[in-house]
A protein has these predicted regions:
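Charge-dense polyanion-binding interfaces
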Residues: 466-483
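Conserved N-terminal alpha-helix of the aminotransferase class I/II PLP-enzyme fold
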Residues: 49-91
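A short N-terminal beta->alpha junction/helix N-cap motif
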Residues: 2-3, 60-64, 258, 283, ...
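Structural signal for conserved beta-strand scaffold positions within catalytic alpha/beta enzyme cores
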Residues: 87, 133-135, 224, 354, ...
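Conserved C-terminal alpha-helix-loop-beta "cap" of PLP-dependent enzymes
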Residues: 294, 300-469
Length: 483
């Protein structure tokens, strides 16, 4: 990384120059620097609304960058150790889908864990690729799926030598890391591309002593959520590619679905955040890791909770653990994770990332302070004292291995009918069902609906999980294939 070049922020600098010129706008957006919508200015501020501008020659164009955006992407590639980088304004969802659409066509096989984000499975609906699932092991106590074991990947490749790609979560939402370097070496030896979903792994590129990043492991493409742990605005992301990937073709794929009206608020936030991480990321993420470790120790000293970390590492299904993650098991105090999540928000004004059936996740990043950690620890101690109960009747287990009947694309576009959830047992799902967050589908199109899955959906609803994916907003009915 050229640290001197990293002091530049070309999109931000171009916007600063643009502001000085007092250009009269006869283009979009129609609020005309906020003059047409004073309430927007009141909410967001004059400076923010004044920078919500359209693509123009001095500001470049994201669909075909030739100047400041191109330079910003080159700086991002240098900072992340990639051959090329693409600034994304459709979230990491669009980056994940661009990876898959760039490597797979209709009928192609892709090897992936089933505990992927819905964006990956949505990409299979779009392109018609066939999933070959490597079903990860479960941690029976925590109820979470683990990483992809190298032996599982080897078996999947042996049985599907014509696969085009392997997709790896690095890390999972809960912080679990696979042996990425070995997976990359194995796949490449068979001529198969490796894609990494690093929605929760921006910090891996800049922190010392953290798990290995996708590009460092030799992956071909990586989708990186700068807005999650990198400090940019929500919805901004970066797609990274290695030297053996045709960057021009990837740009064409991105432009199939990405907006032609890219937000310069998002683009400049990516530019500024990349500079910040390149110059100060190592120091910042060292503090994040320290805060997370302190929180783990304090929470575990309360009793009843289990804030897990590298103590889980076993060298296979948990090859490493992302120590910045603060994942906490709650069932031993008699409360589901979603119940603790709701209590923290409703009674203590603390908003954490998510709560599921067994766990909660508090996202620790460069914007957190030690006093915020103390407040969280105090609230968890209070919740245990005031709300803990007998754990009888609580369901454990966060992931159920699916049985695939037809491809996601075929199922999604098939004729379907609506049936009540428990009456759908034995049918093939025609839609997604998931708790969001984390956005890992309980059911995907083309999968067999078992009694266990149906009961899990009902239980998750009863516990207050936010359910998504179904046509029925109440999630009382499921769309299933007619035949």
């Amino acid at each position: 990384m050229d640290i001197n070049r990293q002091e530049r922020a070309p999109i931000y600098e171009a916007l600063e120059e643009f502001k000085k010129k007092r250009v009269v706008p006869f283009d979009v957006p129609g609020h005309k620097r906020g003059r047409g919508n004073p309430e927007l200015v009141h909410l967001l501020g004059e400076k923010c609304v004044g920078l919500d501008v359209n693509s123009m020659k001095p500001l470049d164009n994201l669909c075909h960058p030739v100047s400041v955006i191109r330079e910003a992407e080159e700086l991002a590639a240098d900072a992340f150790g990639a051959a090329n980088a693409f600034l994304m304004v459709g979230g990491t969802t669009s980056a994940v889908q661009a990876m898959i659409l760039s490597t797979c066509k209709a009928g192609d096989k892709i090897i992936l864990p089933r505990n992927v984000h819905k964006s990956a499975l949505n990409a299979l609906v779009l392109c018609g690729a066939i999933p070959v699932y490597v079903n990860p092991q479960m941690n029976a106590k925590l109820g979470i799926s683990l990483g992809m074991e190298i032996d599982q990947v080897a078996r999947a490749i042996e049985e599907n030598p014509d696969a085009k790609a392997v997709l790896v979560n690095n890390p999972t939402y809960y912080g679990i890391c696979s042996d990425l370097r070995s997976i990359v070496a194995l796949a490449h030896s068979k001529g198969i591309k490796v894609l990494t979903d690093e929605a929760h792994g921006t910090h891996l590129y800049f922190g010392k002593g953290l798990s290995i990043s996708g590009m460092a492991a030799g992956a071909d493409m990586s989708a990186v959520s700068m807005h999650k742990s990198g400090g940019s605005l929500t919805q901004s992301s970066i797609l990274l590619t290695g030297r053996d990937v045709n960057a021009d073709y990837v740009r064409q794929i991105i432009n199939l679905t990405q907006t032609t009206s890219a937000s310069y608020l998002l683009l400049s936030s990516l530019d500024i955040s990349r500079r910040n991480l390149a110059l100060r990321g190592e120091e910042s993420f060292a503090k994040v890791a320290q805060m997370s470790e302190y929180a783990r120790q304090e929470i575990n000293s309360i009793g009843g909770y289990y804030a897990y970390g590298r103590d889980l590492v076993n060298g296979t299904s948990i090859y490493d653990y992302d120590v910045t993650k603060l994942s906490i098991y709650t069932l031993d105090i008699g409360l589901a994770g979603i119940e603790v999540y709701d209590l923290l928000r409703d009674e203590y004004d603390i908003q954490i990332e998510f709560g599921d059936i067994c766990n909660i996740l508090a996202y620790i990043s460069i914007g957190d302070r030690i006093q915020d950690i103390e407040r969280l620890v105090g609230a968890l101690e209070d919740i245990k004292r005031l709300y803990s109960k007998d754990k009888t009747g609580l369901l454990s287990g966060e992931y159920i291995n699916p049985k695939v009947a037809v491809s996601p694309q075929e199922a999604f576009y098939s004729q379907k009918k609506s049936v009540r959830i428990m009456d759908a047992v034995g049918a093939v799902s025609g839609e997604f069902v998931m708790c969001y967050p984390p956005g890992i589908p309980i059911l995907a199109p083309g999968e067999l609906i078992t009694k266990e899955i149906a009961q899990y959906i009902v239980y998750a609803k009863e516990k207050g999980c936010s359910m998504q994916g179904t046509e029925d907003p109440a999630v009382e009915y499921l769309k299933v294939l007619e035949q």
